[in-house]
C-alpha cells in the first residue's frame, strides 16, 4: 500500500491531484522537481535529521499514562509527546523540512497560512533560523482566539496578515496565502501546514511528519515488546494523524482518526468532514469537504482553531474509502472533559486539538482489556489555549 500512494499524478485512488490554475503550474512543477532531488540527497537528509534532533528536540518521548490507565481500568494508554517539540506541537517537523527545501531551491521568503497559530509560529521560527523573510496569513477570527500566537509570530520577525474574507478563519487564510504565492512565486516558497493542497504537498508533508510514527513504532516495541492494538489521532487537515498512521498502515493495528463534532453532528456547527462531508475540490485537491447542495463550502465550527477546516487531506479521504482508518467525531464538551482529566491525572495540559484524540482514546480504552494498549498522538500542548480554557472552565461551556 505504502510505496505506490500517491501515484505519479498525486492521486490517492480517486482523491488528491493538482487542481490549480495555469498560473501556479510552473511553481508546483518546480517544487516537485526540487523535492524529488532533495529526498535522495544524503546531505539534505542529514541536515534535516540534525535539525530535528538539535533544534526541534527529537526524538520525543513515549509516556505511559499510568494514572488514567488505572482509573479507566481498561487498556494501557501511551502518549506520543509531540507537545514537547520546540514551539509546542508537531508542526515544526514539517516546517523544518520545507524550510530547508525552500533554502535549497534558492527562495528567500516563506509564506504560510495558519489556523490555531501553531503552524504560523513554526514557519516564523524556521524563517528566523534560516534568515528568511516570513509572511503568515491568519483569519481575523483565529487572530482573536489565538492572540498569544500572533504576538509570538511577530516577536519571531514574521508579518501576520489578517484574512478578512468569508468566515475569516483557516480556509480564508489559505485562499489569501495561495493568492499571494501566485504573484510572488519567483522568490517565495509556500509552506503548507498540513497534508492538504495540490500534489506534491500532501505527500511531502506526510513524509516530513512520518517521523512521529516511525519513532513511536520503535518506542512501543522497546517499551511493550509489541505494536499497539489501537492508535488514535485528531484530524483537521490531518498531518499529525498521517504522520502517526503511515508507518503502521501495513500492520494489524486499528487506526482511528478523530474529527471535531463541535456542538454535535446533528447541528450545523461541526468540522467533521469525513463523517458528514461529500466529495469536492478544495485548495487544489479532490477530497471530502463540507459543502451545501450547490457546492458552496459550509463554514466549519470547532472550539479548536486547528480543527475547523472544511476539507481534509486527500490521503485521509482515501484511507476512509478503503476502510483502513476509521474516522469518528468528538464534541467540544467531550474534548474539554478529556483535557481536564489529563491535566488532573497526569500533569499534562494538551492542546484542545489533541484533547479530541484523548477523548476517543479514553472512551475506547474503557472497553478494552489491561493486556491491550492504545497509543495516542498528543499533537500539541495547551499553552496557546489558556484564554479559551480559562473562560470555559470558569464561566462554563456555552452549549
UniProtKB/Swiss-Prot annotation:
It is an enzyme of class 4 (lyase). Pathway: Amino-acid biosynthesis; L-tryptophan biosynthesis; L-tryptophan from chorismate: step 5/5. Disulfide bonds: none annotated. One of its GO terms (molecular function) is tryptophan synthase activity. InterPro entries: Trp_synth_b_CS, Trp_synth_beta, Trp_synth_beta/beta-like, TrpB-like_PALP, TrpB-like_PALP_sf. It comes from the Bacteria. One of its GO terms (cellular component) is cytoplasm. Its EC number is 4.2.1.20. Keywords: Amino-acid biosynthesis, Aromatic amino acid biosynthesis, Lyase, Pyridoxal phosphate, Tryptophan biosynthesis. It catalyses: (1S,2R)-1-C-(indol-3-yl)glycerol 3-phosphate + L-serine = D-glyceraldehyde 3-phosphate + L-tryptophan + H2O. The modification N6-(pyridoxal phosphate)lysine is found at residue 91. The keyword Transcription regulation does not apply. Its cofactor is pyridoxal 5'-phosphate. Tetramer of two alpha and two beta chains. Belongs to the TrpB family. The beta subunit is responsible for the synthesis of L-tryptophan from indole and L-serine. HAMAP family: Trp_synth_beta (MF_00133). This is Tryptophan synthase beta chain. It comes from Shouchella clausii (strain KSM-K16).
